[in-house]
A protein has these predicted regions:
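RNA pseudouridine synthases
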Residues: 1-183
Length: 183
């Protein structure tokens, strides 16, 4: 479970001090992340020492589900826009996202407090939605919620294919034998 504030990599060559995955656990030599979660995102991050497995998962259209806390109370109209696809900026051009699954989450997920406070409650209400995509453009889910008027405050990946985060706590690592992902 990648915590907030960590890069989803093991080596960082710029001068600024960043928190890296290798600080969480004594991973085997050659461990790499399958895909990425940005520094501000949390949740399920698959790691492997098998470069072929990494490539298979990244090259296939595997569903990735995110629980997203947004600014304001997201409405059904915004959910339907997300489902149909929205226009976002990508590599300096406009990009229309593919259709996705999206729905409002009525109960607040039990992820525990984030290391850094999201914001003061005096700034108004927030709500949670589930968004499942099978593509992965740079900061795509954040851009999608902003495009429908509900900026992302917290983003937690809860599923990749058939692999779920379940009750794994931030910073915890679970080793999986004979790993296979359903596509």
């Amino acid at each position: 479970h990648k915590p907030y504030g960590y890069l989803s990599q093991f080596i960082y060559e710029l001068k600024r001090k960043k928190k890296l995955l290798g600080e969480l656990y004594n991973f085997p030599k050659g461990t790499m992340a399958i895909g990425r979660l940005d520094e501000d995102s949390e949740g399920l991050l698959l790691l492997t020492t098998d470069g072929m497995m990494s490539e298979v998962v990244r090259s296939k259209k595997v569903d990735k589900e995110y629980y997203v806390q947004v600014d304001g109370i997201i409405n059904q109209e915004a959910i339907e826009q997300l489902q149909k696809g929205v226009e976002i900026g990508f590599n300096g051009t406009k990009y229309s996202t593919k259709r996705c699954k999206a729905f409002l989450i009525h109960e607040i997920p039990a992820f525990g407090a984030r290391g850094k406070k999201i914001r003061d409650e005096r700034h108004g209400p927030t709500s949670w939605a589930s968004i499942t995509v099978n593509e992965g453009k740079f900061r795509q889910v954040r851009k999608m919620t902003a495009a429908v008027g509900f900026p992302t405050l917290r983003l937690v990946r809860v599923r990749i294919g058939n692999v779920r985060l379940n009750d794994l706590q931030a910073g915890e690592v679970k080793e999986v034998e004979n790993f296979q992902i359903e596509i």
